[in-house]
């Protein structure tokens, strides 16, 4: 891999430590990326251990060839939202000792202008995680109604000026369609009312479009629920999120399954029966990167790690 597109895995030591790896365990890296977390997991596994990686990016599948000679490693080309399906097909449901999920966009994806994720590098307005299928960001911007764009920008980007930006995009595309990342980023910078320091005005809109195009929040929801179904008793879940939408989903998921089902007052249900509906327990507090890690890798700044453990029943 070129130095230009090198990738530093975020919270690497903390995330793998959260898995509490057993030498002969079976683990899932649901977001392989360029293999940083997988490499660290393999270091902790014995010869009878097993690691199954998942990624929908064809470039990630290519990068996985670095582990081709390691019999403990295999990779599935697909979205992490379908991890439960892949595990069931392998006959391993309820036998997984740990699931690792990193919801960040990898540095090679961001830095490769041709992928269309970056507002700092000009390239085709694509943004697909799997660029072999699906609608591009340019295609969507060409057809989306103002109301739909405004909803996406506000819901997935928490953009306060969502309607204003959507109207300006709709007006400008009548003259020239948006085909390049720089065209969109320049428009947003020109019309933006944002006063956020150290943040490009297009940050939230680009995030929102990327999340929408790739159905990221739906994938996250499916992955979390899927992890719960495949984990063995005492199996661990280590999850890294990068913005508040993702982190809220993870936090609420762990809390919901740690508290168990709510029961209407007065029903003749025992505490033991309620406890059976508690499927997870949180492990420690949320972990954020150290100042030293942020200095090495500024993209780690917004990351948050949460760890949970599958209960016995």
UniProtKB/Swiss-Prot annotation:
Example of a GO cellular component annotation carried by this entry: cytoplasm
Covalent S-S links between cysteines: none
Domain of life according to the entry: Bacteria
Keyword field contains Glycosyltransferase: no
Localization terms from the record: Cytoplasm
Similarity-based family: Belongs to the methyltransferase superfamily. RsmH family.
GO process annotations (BP): rRNA base methylation
InterPro entries linked to this entry: RsmH, SAM-dep_MeTrfase_MraW_recog, SAM-dependent_MTases_sf
GO molecular-function term, one example from the UniProt record: rRNA (cytosine-N4-)-methyltransferase activity
EC number: 2.1.1.199
HAMAP family: 16SrRNA_methyltr_H (MF_01007)
Catalytic activity: cytidine(1402) in 16S rRNA + S-adenosyl-L-methionine = N(4)-methylcytidine(1402) in 16S rRNA + S-adenosyl-L-homocysteine + H(+)
Keywords: Cytoplasm, Methyltransferase, rRNA processing, S-adenosyl-L-methionine, Transferase
Transmembrane intervals: none
Enzyme kind, highest EC tier: transferase
Function of the molecule: Specifically methylates the N4 position of cytidine in position 1402 (C1402) of 16S rRNA.
Record-listed S-adenosyl-L-methionine binding positions: 35-37, 55, 80, 102, 109
Listed name of the protein: Ribosomal RNA small subunit methyltransferase H
């Amino acid at each position: 891999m070129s130095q230009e597109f090198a990738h530093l895995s975020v919270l690497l030591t903390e995330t793998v430590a959260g898995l509490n790896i057993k030498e002969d365990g079976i683990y899932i890296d649901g977001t392989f990326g360029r293999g940083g977390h997988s490499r660290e997991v393999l270091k902790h596994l014995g010869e009878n251990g097993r690691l199954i990686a998942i990624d929908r990016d064809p470039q990630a599948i290519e990068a996985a060839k670095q582990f081709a000679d390691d019999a403990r490693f295999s990779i599935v080309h697909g979205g992490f939202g379908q991890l439960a399906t892949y595990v069931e097909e392998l006959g391993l449901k309820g036998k997984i000792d740990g699931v690792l999920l990193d919801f960040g966009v990898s540095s090679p994806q961001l830095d490769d202008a041709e992928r269309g994720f970056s507002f700092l590098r000009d390239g085709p307005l694509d943004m697909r995680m799997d660029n072999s299928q699906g609608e591009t960001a340019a295609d969507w911007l060409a057809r989306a109604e103002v109301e739909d764009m405004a909803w996406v920008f506000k819901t997935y980007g928490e953009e306060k000026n969502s309607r204003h930006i959507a109207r300006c995009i709709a007006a400008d595309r009548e003259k020239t369609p948006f085909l390049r990342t720089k065209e969109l980023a320049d428009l947003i910078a020109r019309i933006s009312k944002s006063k956020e320091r150290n943040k490009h005005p297009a940050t939230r809109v680009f995030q929102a479009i990327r999340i929408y195009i790739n159905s990221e929040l739906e994938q996250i929801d499916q992955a979390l629920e899927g992890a719960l179904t495949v984990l063995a008793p005492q199996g661990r879940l280590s999850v890294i999120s990068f913005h508040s939408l993702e982190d809220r989903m993870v936090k609420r998921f762990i809390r919901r399954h740690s508290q168990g089902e709510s029961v209407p007052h007065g029903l003749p249900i025992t505490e033991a029966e309620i406890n059976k509906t508690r499927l997870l327990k949180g492990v420690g507090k949320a972990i954020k990167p150290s100042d030293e890690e942020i200095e090495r890798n500024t993209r780690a700044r917004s990351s948050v790690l949460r760890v949970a453990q599958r209960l016995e029943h």
